[in-house]
Amino acid sequence: MDKLEADAKEAVVLQEKEVVEKRTNEAKAVQDEAEHDLKLAQPELDKAIAAVQKLEKNDIVELKSFTAPPPAVVMTMEPVMLLLGHSKDWKTAKSVMSDATKFLAELKGYDVKTMKEKTIQQIRKDYFKKADFNPSYVGDRSKPAGALCTWLLALSNYQTVYKNIVPKQVKLAEMQAVCQEAQAVLDEK
């Protein structure tokens, strides 16, 4: 190979290297943006976790003991039941809460990433828009229900941000794959 060919090959390699670096920087920017958004959402998730961590078995027993629960308790338990995949009626709620330990574990182990968009949209529309649906009002009627109200609102807020992060994570994975492939080709040269 003469000098002219070597120079031409080197120019191509340098050009490809610049393209790889540009794509890597673009991927890093997407990653930074996704991480930034996730950090903004994290306090909401922490708030949701803290709300259910405060609940104890006796709190669930208190909720379950209502034969005719205050409307604020019903208004809170219905979306909790929907979110957990149960029927929203009070009879079902009492049945689910009959094993307080299991119910608490279900709340504490709830994975917000599996939240169904249709369900949370329904909850937002049917419950969150009510003036009385706030932790203070609900908590004045039942402290455990107030904590669950906080949990619901915080999970909803987290989910709003999280669903916007998912496309960024998909885009990032695609960009990283392209970068790795381009880098492998470049390394062969």
Model-derived segments and their meaning:
Residues 39-189:
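Extended alpha-helical scaffold/assembly modules in large eukaryotic proteins
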Residues 1-38, 45, 172-189:
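Heptad-repeat coiled-coil alpha-helices
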